[in-house]
Each structure stands twice: as structure tokens, then as C-alpha cells.
Regions:
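A conserved beta-strand->alpha-helix junction
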Residues: 118-131
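Secondary-structure transition/capping motifs at alpha-helix termini
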Residues: 32-38, 56-65, 104-109
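Class I S-adenosyl-L-methionine
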Residues: 1-39, 61, 72-77, 113
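Catalytic or ion-translocation cores adjacent to nucleophile or general acid/base/metal-coordination motifs
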Residues: 61-80, 87, 92
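A phosphate-binding catalytic loop at a beta-strand-loop-alpha-helix junction
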Residues: 38-57
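Phosphate/diphosphate-binding loops
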Residues: 91-109
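Conserved helicase/translocase motor-coupling segment
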Residues: 166-172
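Short, basic, low-complexity termini and linkers enriched in Ser/Thr/Gly/Pro
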Residues: 107-118
Length: 172
């Protein structure tokens, strides 16, 4: 779609995605099909047009819609404009679009909306934060209770999210 390609070029300054969805039409579909507090799920988010449309619609009508974008980190072609611009996979393009679109929406607002949420959190599917530690009763010693069982590259936030998920607590 030429309109969608032009919209993305305006945001990034280059044609970095081959088949974006048109923002205008997606915004209209969401406006018709959702209420102001809906949750939108896009399992093939690509360049994150859906997230852009949700933020735009919230800015226009004061809604409180949320979005979940899901995208496999498909690598960008090394000869592509996206790769040359530093985007090694599609997820990076989507995240940057959400950042840029959010800033642009905020700048274009005639009256600042303090309640407008343009932030987002990135969650990645990964292995457990805990080391695989197995003891048989014969091997167990009380001193082993003090051993560090958290993988070295994990953050406190990683641990928090794992515990929340294990306990069935919602992440937002």
C-alpha cells in the first residue's frame, strides 16, 4: 500500500518496511470495533501500525485502550534500508515506531492530555531465571541453601516478572 509506505517513510525518513498496514484504515476499524477501554492484540504486529493506531485513537477521543503486539524477531535483510538504519530484526522496527509515533502524537496535541499513555514494555520469551539445580537427598547439605541459583545475566525485574507469572498475577 503506497499510503502506508509513505506514512512509515515520514516516521523513519526511509522506506524500512515492505508491507505496512495503512494507519488511516486501521484507526477507523479500531474506532468502529472497540470501546474506549478495549485491549487490542496483534499477533503479527510487523511495524506496529496497530499500536500506532491505538495511541492515535486514544489521543483523539480520550480513550484508554491498551495494546499487546506480538512479533517473532525475524531478521531484516542485510541489504535492506532497515538493516542499514540499524534495525537487525522486525521487532526493533516496531519498537522504534511506537516510540516515534508516541512522540509525534504528543507533539501534535493541541491540548496536552496528561492521561495519554504512550509508554510500552517489551517482554521476551526466555528460559527460567533460575539455574537448573537438582539435589538428591544424599547430596543435599544445608549449606547449599545459600548457593546463588539465579542466572548471572538476569535482572531484578526479570525475577519479579517470573514470580508474578508463576503466581498468576497480571503484569499490568
Amino acid at each position: 500500500n503506497q499510503i502506508a509506505t509513505r506514512e512509515l517513510r515520514d516516521i523513519f525518513g526511509a522506506s524500512i518496511f515492505t508491507s505496512p498496514k495503512p494507519l488511516k484504515y486501521l484507526t477507523r476499524y479500531l474506532q468502529i470495533g472497540l470501546n474506549k477501554d478495549s485491549l487490542v492484540l496483534d499477533f503479527f504486529s510487523g511495524s506496529a501500525t496497530t499500536a500506532h493506531a491505538v495511541m492515535k485513537l486514544n489521543a483523539e477521543d480520550g480513550g484508554n485502550r491498551k495494546f499487546i503486539m506480538v512479533q517473532l524477531p525475524e531478521k531484516t535483510d542485510e541489504k535492506s534500508e532497515a538493516y542499514k538504519a540499524g534495525y537487525k530484526n522486525i521487532c526493533e522496527i516496531g519498537k522504534e515506531r511506537i516510540r516515534r509515533a508516541g512522540r509525534k502524537i504528543n507533539e501534535e496535541l493541541e491540548v496536552k492530555n496528561e492521561k495519554l499513555d504512550i509508554g510500552f514494555r517489551v517482554l521476551k520469551l526466555d528460559s527460567s531465571n533460575m539455574e537448573d539445580v537438582y539435589y538428591t537427598p544424599q547430596e543435599f547439605e544445608l549449606q547449599s541453601l545459600f548457593n546463588e541459583n539465579v542466572k548471572a545475566d538476569r535482572t531484578n525485574e526479570d525475577l519479579l516478572f517470573q514470580v508474578m507469572l508463576d503466581l498468576g498475577i497480571e503484569l499490568s
